[in-house]
Amino acid sequence: MAGSEEQWPRRREDGDPDAAAAPLQDAELALAGINMLLNNGFRESDQLFKQYRNHSPLMSFGASFVSFLNAMMTFEEEKMQLACDDLKTTEKLCESEEAGVIETIKNKIKKNVDARKSTPSMVDRLQRQIIIADCQVYLAVLSFVKQELSAYIKGGWILRKAWKIYSKCYVDINALQELYQKKLTEEPLASDAANDNHVVAEGVTEESLSRLKGAVSFGYGLFHLCISMVPPNLLKIINLLGFPGDRLQGLSSLTYASESKDMKAPLATLALLWYHTVVRPFFALDGSDNKGGLDEAKAILLRKESAYPNSSLFMFFKGRIQRLECQINSALTSFHTALELAVDQREIQHVCLYEIGWCSMIELNFKDAFDSFERLKNESRWSQCYYAYLTAVCQGATGDVDGAQLVFKEVQKLFKRKNNQIEQFSVKKAERFRKQTPTRALCVLASIEVLYLWKALPNCSFPNLQRMSQACHEVDDSSVVGLKHLLLGAIHKCLGNSQDALQFFQRAARDELCRQSNSYVPPYACYELGCLLLDSAETVGRGRTLLLQAKEDFSGYDFENRLHVRIHAALASLRELVPQ
C-alpha cells in the first residue's frame, strides 16, 4: 500500500490551480497513515510517512510522530535522539515556510491576484503553527523521560510555548468558523469587500476549518485534561507557567478531535479510551465509583469497531473495560488476542503481557502472573527493576521462596531510575527479602499490596477477595501489622462491609511501627477513612477533615504524589456536591 504512489497526491507547486485543495489531500494521506498504524501496520505506516516526508509539513510531522512513538515504546537512547532530531527538522520546516504569512499580506495588496491564492497560505499558516506546537509537546515529553531537574525545567518552558500557540490557534479557528457561518447566512454588504476579515474568509471551506479545529483540539484538549488532574501542591508551578485545567473542556475538545478528519483523530480516540479506562480508575477520579467512564469507553469502541477491526490497541482497551467490569476471564481472552495481533510490535505485546500478569494476580493465579512478569523482566527496557520485584513476589507466592529470593537480590542491581517512585518502592520492598528468605505468606501479602496500590482490588471477584482476606489474617509478623490492617480495610470496603473496613483503617492509621517500615500506610489509611465517611451526610465534615489531614500532615512517603492526585479528586467531587 505504501509503495503505490498513484493512489496518493503528488506534490503541488504554488502555481498549480488546484493547490488550494492540497492541504486536505495531505490530511487524507496523513490520516490514512495513522489508521494504518493503528490497524497493526506499524512498518507500512512508517514506510508511507518516510516516502512522503518531503511532500508537505503535515507528512513530515507524520514521519516524526511515528519516530516519536517508536522512541516512547522502546526507551532506547538512540531512538529517542532520532525522534528529537526528526521533530526539530519538522519544526524548522514549518518555521521556514512561515513565509506564507507574508505571502498572504502581498496577496491582499495585489488586486489582480486570484483571491483563492491567499487561502492555502492562511490555512497552511495555522496548520504549521499547530504542528510546531505538537512538535514542542513531544520534545518536552522526550525531555521529561530523562528525569533530570534541568530537563523538567526545560520541558516546562517548552510546554508553555506550545500552550500559547494552541490557545491562540484555537481562538483564531473558532473566530474563522463564526465568520464563515455569518458569511453563509448574511447577505454581504458592499463595504465588506474592503474588510480584512472578508478577505481572510474568502475561499475558506467549512471542511478545512473543521479539520483545523480537530487538529488543534487534540493538543488543546490534552492540556486541559492533564492539568485538571494536577494536585494543589503543584498548582502554583502550573499557574506560573500559565496553564489552564478544565476537565470538561478537555474531554469536549478531545471528543471533537476524535470525530474530525485530521490525522490526530485516531490518537484523540485512544487518548479518550486511555483516560476512561486507565486514568479515571487509577487516580480514583470518580471516588468510590469504580466503573465511572466505562459507558463512555464502550460507546467509543462501538463507534470505532468497523474502522479498526484488527487493531491490537483497540482490543487492548476492550480488555481494560472487561477487567474493570470484573470479567477477568474475558479480559484475559482479549489481552491474549491483542498479544497475537501485535506479533510485529514488541512494545504493544509488552503492554498486553503486563495486563495478563495483573489479571492473573487478580485471580490469584501466581504461576501465570510469574510467567508474564518474568518475560517482561527479560525483554522490556522500561523498568526491569519493577518487573523483577513483581516476578519475585509472584514466584514466592507460588511457594518457590528460594527462587524468589534470588530474584529479589536482582532488584537492587536493576535499579537505574533513581528518581522513579515505582523503582524506589521496589528496591525498598525487596531489601528485606534480599537479606532473609521470604515466606509464602509474606509474598502473597506483597501481591495484595501492589493490587491495592494500583487500584486493582475493585476488579477482584468476591470469592477472591475473601481468599485475600484469609491470606492477610494468616500473616503473623509484627512489622507488617499496619499494612495488613490497611489491606484488610480495603478488601472489606470492596466487599461492602463498611463498618469492618472503618475499623481496620482506623487501626492502620494508628499503627506506629509502620511509620518506619511502611511509611505510606498512615496517610493512605487516613485517605481511605475520609473517603468512607464522605458516603454519609452525617459524617461528610469529618471525612473532609481526614482528607485534608492526609494531604497536609504527612510527607516523604511512597507514592505521595499518587495519593495527592486522589485526594485532590475526592475534594473536587465534594465541592461539586457541596459548594464551599
From Swiss-Prot:
**The keyword Membrane belongs to this UniProt entry's keyword annotation:** no
UniProt keyword Repeat present: yes
Sorted alphabetically, the keyword list is: Repeat, TPR repeat
Task: Enumerate the TPR repeat regions by residue range.
Answer: 312-345, 350-383, 482-515
- Family as reported in the entry's similarity comment: Belongs to the TTC39 family.
Q: Protein name, please? A: Tetratricopeptide repeat protein 39C
Q: Which organism is it from?
A: Mus musculus
Q: What gene is it encoded by?
A: Ttc39c
